[in-house]
Regions:
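Acidic, metal-coordinating catalytic segment for phosphate/diphosphate chemistry
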Residues: 2-36
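Nudix hydrolase/Nudix homology domain
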Residues: 54-55, 125-186
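Conserved Nudix-box catalytic region and its N-terminal flanking loop in Nudix hydrolases
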Residues: 40, 44-83
Length: 186
């Protein structure tokens, strides 16, 4: 069973970077900080499935002004999954996605995502999705790690959102940890 501890960081957190297209990452970068929830239950993970794109992603999103990471995780879990956040464990790792900036004066736009181990309440209520989440057909569900990873790998073979590569690499890291006995979510 994955354990929750007050430790602020997982023993060996992952650190992954992605560059989408021609991007100058050593110039002025505008950063957007996001949080993502890794919620294990038995042999499964709580993920959000896009019925439009077919991919799976971890619940999460941007941190609003004045929000702590904990508050942002709670808001995103309720919006996307109808889940009540009960506990935040350690930081499992982070990703950085760079793409060309659209804003004047910046060379790159970076989405920095922090992945936290989370525990939720037993009951899910109706999600409260944002309009874009409704357009993408977001639907929460419990998925086996191997199944989720294979689903996203299949999606990567065709046109898919840029975030699919990020989520696939994180799922692959969790699978490696699981195989090494580090992330035993069962």
């Amino acid at each position: 069973m994955t354990t929750f501890s007050p430790a602020s960081c997982w023993p060996n957190p992952f650190d992954l970077s992605f560059v989408h297209g021609e991007v100058r990452t050593d110039g002025r970068t505008l950063e957007r900080l996001t949080v993502r929830a890794v919620v294990p239950r038995g042999d499964e993970l709580l993920l959000v499935h896009s019925r439009v794109n077919g991919d799976l992603m971890f619940p999460g999103g941007g941190i609003e002004a004045g929000e702590s990471h904990h508050v942002a995780l709670a808001r995103e879990l309720l919006e996307e999954c109808g889940a009540e956040l009960r506990e935040v464990g350690g930081l499992l790792g982070e990703t950085r996605e760079y793409r060309a900036a659209r804003e004047p004066g910046f060379d790159a736009y970076c989405i920095r995502s922090l992945y936290y181990l989370c525990r939720i309440g037993d009951q899910l209520v109706a999600p409260q999705p944002q309009p874009y989440e409704i357009r993408l057909g977001f639907m929460p569900g419990w998925f086996a790690l191997d199944e989720a990873l294979q689903t996203n790998k299949t999606q990567l073979a065709g046109p898919c959102p840029q975030w699919t590569a990020r989520e696939t690499r994180v799922l692959a890291q969790l699978q490696r940890w699981h195989q090494q006995g580090i992330f035993d979510h069962g």
